[in-house]
Amino acid sequence: MEEFQGYLELYRSWQDNFLYPLILQESIYALVHNQDLGLNGSILLSKKKGYDTKYSLLVVKRLVIRMYQQNFVILSLNDSNKNEFFVPNKNLYSQRISEGFAVLAEIPFSMRVMSSLKGKERKQYQNLRSIHSIFPFLEDKFSRLNHVLDILIPHPVHTKILVQTIRYCVKDISCLHLLQLLLYEYCNNGITLKGSVSNLSKNKNQRFLLFLYNSYVCECESIFVFLRNQSSHLRSTSYGAFLARVYFYLKLEHFLKVFTKHFRVILQFFKDPFMHYVRYQGKWILASRGTFLLMTKLKYYFVNFWQCNFYLWLQTRRIYINKSLNQPIDFIGFLLSVRLNPSVVRSQMLENSFLIYNGIKKFETLVPTMSLIGSLAKAKFCNVLGHPISKPAWADLSDSDIIRRFGRMCRNLSHYYSGSSKKGGLYRIKYILRLSCARTLARKHKSTVRAFMKRLGSEFFEEFFFKEEKVISLILSRDSSISRRLYRGPIWYFDIFCIHDLASHND
């Protein structure tokens, strides 16, 4: 039991004192007030390990001096309207203090991440940072899994739970009192952590609230780290190592060395992990090859663990057990599912013949057509039923600008959803955008869509084709079998670094 307890300590030795001399001697809201200077991000550290910033403490000192030299009496009303820093607001100072607290609190967490990469040269290869790079891994692993746990991340019922979470990483009592004071004031102003991550990012105190949310979720995820370590005897390297190809080769080389030295005969150590885990859009997704009974036991185990250790009232109906063969999962703008392809093989032995029915699992990535149509309807490209309509807001633009905007949306969608196994939904979305563009141009010129399309001809659709589609159509005929396989099969690209706006569910 003592050995298991050590896994749940969660880096308790990483307890740091924050930079309180800087807080007490200077005005902390000057550190984070950078809107009028055009600065981005944190300006606190000079060249601290783990921070990529070109600003130094000298800039902070100049900001403080500039603030002290301002004369608040002679400020006109027009100046105060331009700069909210000088607007009388009782919540302004607490907001600046909270943002400054988040800047300082991020220091030990950044040092913890950098310590895992100690002694390694950090090289960046953009082609391995693509969102699409995870799908080839899922194609190999996901089809072997049986059940998926879809867990909605529980929200803390009281602010003291957040303070207790930070207490594991910070031993400064005054820091905890300051945190509790800020949370108490935010609760009085109606600012809480209840809601999704997208709602938190829209808040004015997003840096402070996101820091609390991430630290709280990190503490709740300790049970997943514990289960992962118990199910696999060879621990994986840090997630940051997978940002570069060189670390992948180093890990592979280390794997071969360990295999030849220690585990030459005992091959069961190299079995697949007990479960696969990912956090996405305010929920946890766990996939495993276990039975339904095992997943049910894990479900109630998670509920009891979070209630006893973090005082979270997590109801069992917020955890869903999905069979990966039937119910698709929404992940990074795609619908993931595993389809069973039946096949019949006729076997004959001497004079007797019989049929053998086999089922082959196939991993599928589908385009969420209904959610994309809903996003297009909100953007006024179509109605809720998916019927294209004109875009009145773009009717004042030139014809080339209108065609360029619609064409860019089509190409971006084709680029992002090129890995879908079935392209029917993607073709429907592109059809909506093409016809919406034609209706917008016809509305501008006060003509009908048919007459306008007849006047433009086939050159009108050239702007809507993706460049890879043009190359394939030039090399191969559309009627050839190779061309049909290229169009229908998934194509993954390694230059996609963010989720498409229509698929992010934040609109």
Curated annotation (Swiss-Prot):
Gene Ontology biological process: mRNA processing; RNA splicing; tRNA processing
GO molecular function, one term: RNA binding
Keyword annotations of the record: Chloroplast, mRNA processing, Plastid, RNA-binding, tRNA processing
Family: Belongs to the intron maturase 2 family. MatK subfamily.
Pfam assignment, any one: MatK_N
Subcellular location: Plastid, Chloroplast
Protein name: Maturase K
Membrane-traversing stretches: none
InterPro entries named among the record's database cross-references: Domain_X, Maturase_MatK, Maturase_MatK_N
Cellular component GO terms, alphabetical: chloroplast
Main location: plastid
Species assigned in the record: Fagopyrum tataricum
Xref: HAMAP family: MatK
Function (record text): Usually encoded in the trnK tRNA gene intron. Probably assists in splicing its own and other chloroplast group II introns.
